Amino acid sequence: MDSRLPRLVFALLAIYAAIHFSSSYAQMPEVVASHFNAHGVPNGWQTKTAFFGVFVAMTVLSVVIGFGLSAIIGAVPIQLINLPNKQYWLSPEHRGATLEFLKSYFAWFSCSIYLVMIVFFDYAVQSNLHPESPPVASHLWYTLAAFLTFVFAWLIRMFARFGRPPRQNVGS
């Protein structure tokens, strides 16, 4: 698995977010609704500087999770790694392919987290820019359902990949 594509996707998402949110910054009130209940009604506020600061901090966190974690895994002693059948998957002959898979896999996970963040932050931005006709909160639930479906499929794929070592061809 090649990790260049998810890196490119993440970079494009970051560029989009930077352009999109920076164009909205000046139009936002100084104090913005930043937290909403399940029905989309605001119930928490903060300054717009703090609001966008949280977005930047969460962007950095998603980079660390998606791109830093796989680098850390490669440097950590094998006994500290929690991976099914790790003796096989992290043996010298399989370690490189395993780490490359994890690097790409966590990069895609980071992209999904970041996309969800963008959708949720955009909901808050649009709610502040158009308080008389805020966006429909159900879109957030659909986004959350799609993300949870992705995570479920992501975990299944992870366990399918590492759940057991491939069978050796006996007698060939």
Indicate residue ranges for each PLM-predicted region:
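Active-site and channel-lining beta-strand-loop segments
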Residues: 22-53
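Membrane-water interface of transmembrane alpha-helices
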Residues: 24, 64-86, 155-162
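Juxtamembrane inter-helical linkers in multi-pass membrane proteins
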Residues: 76-97, 168-172
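Alpha-helical transmembrane segments and their membrane-interface junctions
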Residues: 19, 108-129
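Loop-to-transmembrane boundary segments
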Residues: 93-113
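Alpha-helical transmembrane segments and their immediate juxtamembrane interface regions
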Residues: 52, 99, 123, 127-172
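Alpha-helical transmembrane segments
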Residues: 11-12, 47-69, 139-149
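Alpha-helical transmembrane segments and their helix-start/interface "positive-inside/aromatic belt" motifs
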Residues: 1-14, 55, 100-107
